[in-house]
Amino acid sequence: VTSLFNNYARRAVHLVKGQGTIVTDDKGKEYLDFTSGIAVVSLGHAHPAIVKALQEQSEKLWHISNLFESPEQEKLAESLTKHTDLSYALFCNSGAEANEAAIKLARKHTGKHLILTFKQSFHGRTFGAMSATGQDKIQAGFGPMLESFEALPFNDVTALKQAVNGNVAAIMLEVIQAEGGVNSVEPAFAEAIMEACREHGILLIIDEVQTGIGRTGTRYAYEQTALKPDIISLAKGLGGGFPIGALLAGEKFFDTFGPGSHGTTFGGNPLAVSVAQTVVDHVFDPAFLKNVQEHAAYLKKQLQAELPGGKYTVRGNGLLIGIHSSKEIGPYIQEAEKQGLLLVPAGTHVIRLLPPLTVSKEEIDQAVAILKNVLT
């Protein structure tokens, strides 16, 4: 008997403790966590710096709403924007909220409504974000979606050129479609998007909810492409396990959201900001990012060496890796769990690997050994 809704296919594992990449269940069994709470636990479980930040802030101030000035929000906003061409941040609580804000900002700023998204994308489960998501299974059963969203084939330059015109407010995409199968934007497609934006005055919204904050080895995944965003949405890894989202946007948007035009009660509360600042200070350190890049390259190399290429394809970037299988991967994930490795799917045929950014080579070796045993 349960008092919870049945909207999650929960696994029969009760996790009670975590430290770094290791989590422990109520029976004392340890697992390598290569889910990171779905790309959330950037610095691993119970990172000392995050624990300290949360403890110290919890003894000062928990919540005041956004009716009052916040130097802490100002500092975090500067940390997130200073390495970009963007100027301002707005804080919320989740990726879906950040994407809702991005949609509202683009429509209000341009006075246009049409937003082009892509098939197999995932932008959230609130109604605007769900309408932007290019997956029928996410939208099924909820009636008509919001108007003025069109999902195009991903990486299809011809389809993009046919769809763009002066009525388009924005193009919205993920650099890597994580939920949709770990599909990366191709260089030619990125160039075509930028050309379309320049030619038609279209805004570019990049959803970095899963790829941002060091997940791909750079601060933001778009940095490794030709894409130049006008708007970025963030969440997941930004809080290292504490709920926080953010919208970043350029100088020209400052007056678009005037007082009362958009808001959130909890967004940017002192607890969330203190944790996020700690995460950003760690992850945006060049030495930390270099370490992520090195460990990501090692993980990919080991997977390609140990898994038969005819049966599996390894794709993705940084520590967001997908293993594509010709067979459905549900049984593989279940068997890996039995052997002490937690994984998450990306659709029915892709295993997604999302270890903490602090994962060690020894932990990578252990995970690859389990995967080899399960998949071969």
Language model region names:
Residues 1-376:
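Conserved N-terminal phosphate-binding loop of PLP-dependent enzymes in the Aspartate aminotransferase
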